[in-house]
Structure formats: structure tokens, C-alpha cells
A protein has these predicted regions:
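Conserved catalytic cores of very large enzyme subunits
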Residues: 1-120, 124-624
């Protein structure tokens, strides 16, 4: 590869595009202007190889890119394009992996040969004996996964993994260098958008005795993430009403910097749902997450939790443009038409799930200690996970139909159908009326909560009996990265959303209401194990407000955990700052924002994502 091209590609998002045929160049429409090379020219310089871990490890050029005293190597010239789908988007159990004694299989011998080629005393296959050697061992195994084409590689519960090692005087420096080393290949590791690496570290959590686990490593990781101030890796704090408030305060101080970490997950709610889904208690209490927030069992599961989207908003649009809509004589008739569209969507999803063929994976199977390959059903849990988009659009559209058509009789069904088909053109009053949603999704309205729960329950009936070819089940959740991309391909809905506009992000309501209102809404949603695949409350908070009220927000969050929220993430930002950053990017090279389940530099985002965040911040701050 030409040296100048390689240098450009190291800092551009072309490698992630190559890793999956699902990527599109639409996101990179400004690629030539931004990176000084056309995608076609850049593609010519890349050698794509099939998935063959021993071959890749033999071929890979070794060059240390680690920070401080750590060794870390990834060869940029190797991009893996598998025949089938590589299993990824999950952590391994690094406590098991770093203590693994290798045997004499092909994959084990290839790992030993790779380590021998590294030829560095820091990198061994011996069991770690202290913090430094444990972190180095994690980095080695982590790099093997990335090098062989696995994406969205999580880190698991590192405070628990490292608990056995005494904390040395230089622990903070070591952990900071460890995090920086993981970040050093930020672009190479990114998925659809720059920053979407899946490098998530879990901290804290309930144990099987109902006691809350945390230690000095828990606090150190939070302090170090705040100190290095990078968008990646990211943290998820497993929370409980039994957790110490000072740990929540420390987490709020970290979030106040704007880096979007940690995300919060409520063990008091999540763990019982996972047991209800079918996990053994010991696995439920030791749960991890996929790349963003989707719960799974660490180290013994196939669980791929981002395989499809239930498209509530798109189903609602289909109802609104259906010629038979005007035949409905009651609200229940309309609701049943919606359910029929939803059932059709679920059938399409299940058909798609059945078509997936997984790539045989001797490396991942080894790292899980499986007797048969994970791609052939060798894991303890072989479940799937799907996400969903547009629940707020569906709920608010249905509530508007109920109120304005069947209760107040201001419109007929033909009237609202025309408004949607016309995309609110010349209907400013209608747009204003349907956009209000004063008692809609995200509020404490009993009607909105009841309707949301009905739709959740109905969705569960469509999926609860599904079994994949390994006998695994499927769970869904009310969060998804698809709120913008799917919205771009969906017509108008009757909540004031116009054709092509984004859907609401996860469980959110950007109208400036108190944080407690949206928390109370989510805490009243009736999830089961089938609907436990990430239900993230996404809140926008003015940066100045959080910085000046860390203790108060910690109290709010503890109350939310006690009331029963599922998960929560914070985007701490300022409308004025975002507008200025878009106009003058050179002034804000380090401005970090939260996207769907990851953080990224604002300047790295495509324009439509910048605009979406700006619009959300504008609504949140009540700016006209």
C-alpha cells in the first residue's frame, strides 16, 4: 500500500465500510473533500481476505501501537470479508481468557506462533500476576479478535475481572494508558459511524446475594475515563437501589464533562427480566451488554442483539395511507389495523433471522471454552436480539386519532389520511395541533402509558414462540441506532413528524420537561424477558445545569433507579455550542456528543446527525 494512502486511510472511515456489505457510501458522500482521496482509489489499495484466523495471524504485520508500557498491534492492510456472518457485538469473559492454557489445536498453535513473532517480553501467554500483566493480557486477546475481523468487541466487567489483583501505586497511570491503547485504533474499529466501536466496559452490579459489588477499580475506571476525556472506550455502570450514592455522584461528575459515560443500567429491573427470559440466575447476575446496551450472558452465549428492527413508526405510516383506514368505525378498529401491520413486520423479521448463516469461529469458540463451534450452536445460550424504532410516533399518532377523530370529531379518518399523504403541506394549524402531544409518549399520562404497554404486550405475542435453528429465543427492546436512517425512508406520521424526519431517539421526549417525568413514564412500562433487549431512556441535559447540580442529578438518578427505570444515557450539551461547532468546526476539535449508544467527536459526524442533535438541543432548551 502506498505510504500516503495508508496514512490517509488510518484516519478515515473506509475500513469500517469494508468490513460489512451493510455499510453504505452515502454516509461518506464528502469523503474525497474530507480525506483527500476518493473511495474508489482507496479501495484499490486494500487487500480483502476471507475469514481464516490462523492465516490472518500468520500474515499480519506486527508493529507496536500501544501507549506507555503496553503492547498492541493491528495490521491495517488486512480487512476481512467473510463468506457468512461473523459473530461479534459481544464481550468475552476476560477472567477466563487471560487464564487460558493453550493446547495443540490449529488455532491454539497459530496464537502461540503469533505471540512468538511479537517477540516482546511484555506479551506472554502466561497467567497474569498483577494489574499490569492482566491489562496487557486483555489487550493481546482483544487485538486478536479485532485483527481477525470481529467488530464491536466489548470488554466485559473489568472491575470484577481485575478484583483479584492488588492496586499498585501507578494504577491510575496504567489504566489510563490501557484505555488510550484501546482508543488508538479508534477509526479502524469504528462501525457505521466513526466512534461506533462497541468498546464498552461494565462496572459494578448486584451479586446473587442481592449485595452491590463495586471496588476501587470501579472508581478508578470512572476517574480515568473522565481524565483522558476521549469518546471511546465507554462505560456502563450497573446500578441498584443498594449502590453507594457517592458512586452515582462520581458517575454524574464524569457525565458532566460531556463524554457520555457512564450509561446506567438498573440491575433491580434487568436481572429479573433476564431470568424470566430463561437465563440461569448466576448468568443473569453476571450479565454484560452488546456494543451499546443490549443485555447478554458474558462468555457463554452466541447472543447477537442487533439483528433487525421492529418498525413501529413505519407500521403506523402504513396504517395512515391504507385505503381501508376510512372503513374503521372505532378506535379499536384502527388499533387492530396497526397490529396487523406490526404482525407483518414481525413475520418479515423472523424470516430474515432464519436466513442467517454464521461463520465458523474457532478463535471465539476457544475463548469461550466451547466443545463445539459457536457458529454451530455450541454456546450455552443461542438467543437472538432485535431492536425497535418509532414507538413514540406510533403511540402519539394513535392517541391523536383517538382524540381528534373519535372523541372530539374535529377530523375524519379521510382528513387525517390526506394530511399525512400531503406531508402537512399548507396545514400549519394541523401540524401544530398534531405536534403538541401534550399527554403523549414520555409523559405521565395514564392513557399514553397504557397504550405503550398494550403495544409492547402485542409485540411480545408475535415473538415469544420464535425459536432459531439452535433452539434459541428472541428478545426485543425499545431502543435502536436506526431512528434517523429508518426515519429517512418513512413517510409522515400523525404526531407532527414529516416524511423523512428522524424518529424520537430511544425512549425520549425532547420538550424540556423535568427529568423525573420521563423517568416516571419509563418506570411504568411493563417489560418482560421477551422485551428486555435494551430499553434506554435517552435524556438531553444542558451542560451548565448538570455541572452546577451534580448532587441533585445523582439524587434524581437514585430515585429513578428505585422507581424502576430500565436503562438511561445522558447527552450533556448546549444548543448554542452545537450551532457554533457546526459553523466553526476548527474551534471545537474535541467536542464530544452521545449518538445512539456511543460517543463521538461532533466534527466526525455526518451533517444529518449534527442537525439531529442540534434540533433535539433546541427543543430541550425551548428555543424558537
Amino acid at each position: 500500500m502506498k505510504k500516503e494512502i495508508k496514512k490517509l486511510l488510518k484516519n478515515s472511515p473506509l475500513y469500517p465500510f469494508l468490513r460489512s456489505t451493510k455499510r453504505t457510501l452515502r454516509i461518506y458522500k464528502e469523503y474525497p473533500q474530507k480525506y483527500g482521496v476518493s473511495p474508489i482509489e482507496a479501495l484499490k489499495e486494500i487487500e480483502v481476505c476471507k475469514y481464516d484466523a490462523p492465516y490472518i495471524l500468520k500474515k499480519a504485520t506486527i508493529k507496536n501501537q500501544g501507549i506507555g508500557d503496553f503492547f498492541y498491534s493491528l495490521d491495517h492492510s488486512i480487512v476481512v470479508e467473510p463468506k457468512n456472518t461473523i459473530i461479534h457485538n459481544m464481550p468475552v469473559d476476560y477472567d477466563y481468557v487471560t487464564n487460558l492454557e493453550l493446547g495443540d489445536s490449529v488455532i491454539e498453535n497459530s496464537i502461540k506462533a503469533y505471540v512468538k513473532r511479537i517477540n516482546d517480553p511484555r506479551v506472554t501467554l502466561e497467567k497474569p500476576h498483577d494489574l499490569k500483566s492482566a491489562l496487557q493480557s486483555i489487550l493481546l486477546w482483544n487485538s486478536l479478535l479485532w485483527q481477525t475481523g470481529h467488530n464491536l468487541v466489548g470488554l466485559g466487567r473489568l472491575d470484577k475481572v481485575l478484583a483479584k489483583y492488588p492496586i499498585p501505586e501507578d494504577a491510575e497511570e496504567l489504566i489510563c494508558d490501557f484505555l488510550k491503547t484501546l482508543h488508538c485504533e479508534y477509526t479502524f474499529k469504528s462501525g457505521v459511524l466513526k466512534g461506533d466501536t462497541g468498546q464498552i466496559i461494565l462496572l459494578g452490579g448486584l451479586d446473587e446475594n442481592g449485595e452491590y459489588f463495586c471496588n476501587e477499580y470501579t472508581k478508578l475506571f470512572i476517574k480515568c475515563i473522565e481524565k483522558i476525556h476521549l469518546p471511546d472506550p465507554k462505560l456502563l455502570l450497573r446500578c441498584s437501589k443498594n449502590m453507594p450514592k457517592e458512586l452515582m455522584e462520581l458517575s454524574m461528575e464524569c457525565n458532566a464533562t460531556g463524554i457520555g459515560s457512564p450509561l446506567f443500567s438498573n440491575d433491580d429491573i434487568v436481572i429479573p427480566k433476564l431470568i424470566d427470559f430463561g437465563y440461569e440466575a448466576k448468568d443473569a447476575y453476571n450479565y454484560g451488554v452488546s456494543a451499546c446496551w443490549e443485555p447478554l450472558s458474558i462468555g457463554n452465549s452466541l447472543e447477537q442483539n442487533n439483528l433487525a428492527n421492529v418498525e413501529y413508526g413505519s407500521c403506523m405510516h402504513q396504517v395512515l395511507v391504507d385505503e381501508k383506514l376510512s372503513d374503521c368505525s372505532t378506535f379499536d378498529d384502527v388499533l387492530n389495523v396497526f397490529y396487523k401491520k406490526l404482525e407483518g413486520n414481525s413475520i418479515q423479521i423472523k424470516t430474515g433471522l432464519d436466513r442467517i448463516v454464521w461463520e465458523d469461529d474457532p478463535l471465539l469458540s476457544l475463548m469461550m471454552g466451547l466443545k463445539s463451534d459457536i457458529a454451530q450452536g455450541g454456546a450455552k445460550y443461542n438467543d437472538y436480539g432485535i431492536l425497535s424504532v418509532g414507538m413514540s410516533a406510533a403511540v402519539n399518532s394513535l392517541l391523536n386519532i383517538k382524540k381528534f377523530v373519535f372523541e372530539e370529531h374535529k377530523y375524519t379518518l379521510k382528513d387525517v389520511q390526506k394530511i399525512v399523504l400531503d406531508n402537512y403541506q399548507d396545514s400549519a394549524d394541523d401540524f401544530s395541533l398534531f405536534s403538541e402531544n401534550a399527554n403523549g409518549y414520555g409523559t405521565e399520562s395514564d392513557e399514553a402509558i397504557s397504550l405503550t404497554n398494550k403495544i409492547i404486550s402485542k409485540t411480545e405475542t408475535f415473538f415469544k414462540d420464535y425459536r432459531n435453528k439452535f433452539g434459541g429465543k428472541v428478545k426485543f427492546g425499545l431502543s435502536s441506532p436506526g431512528y434517523l436512517m429508518i426515519g429517512q425512508n418513512c413517510g409522515a406520521t400523525l404526531d407532527g413528524r414529516k416524511a423523512g424526519e428522524a424518529f424520537q431517539t430511544h425512549i425520549s421526549r425532547d420538550k424540556g420537561e423535568p427529568l423525573t417525568e420521563i423517568m416516571n413514564f419509563e418506570s411504568k412500562l411493563k417489560f418482560t424477558g421477551t422485551s428486555a433487549n435494551a430499553n434506554v431512556l435517552d435524556v438531553m441535559v444542558p451542560s451548565s445545569l448538570l455541572k452546577d447540580n451534580v448532587d441533585k442529578f445523582a439524587t434524581y438518578m437514585m430515585a429513578g433507579i428505585k422507581s424502576g427505570i430500565f436503562q438511561l444515557q445522558m447527552n450533556v450539551l448546549s444548543y448554542a455550542q452545537l450551532v457554533d461547532a457546526k459553523a466553526h468546526p476548527e474551534k471545537y476539535p474535541n467536542l464530544i456528543v452521545r449518538v445512539w449508544g456511543f460517543s463521538a467527536y461532533f466534527n466526525d459526524l455526518p451533517e444529518e446527525y449534527k442537525d439531529h442533535l442540534i434540533n433535539r438541543a433546541k427543543q430541550m432548551e425551548h428555543i424558537n
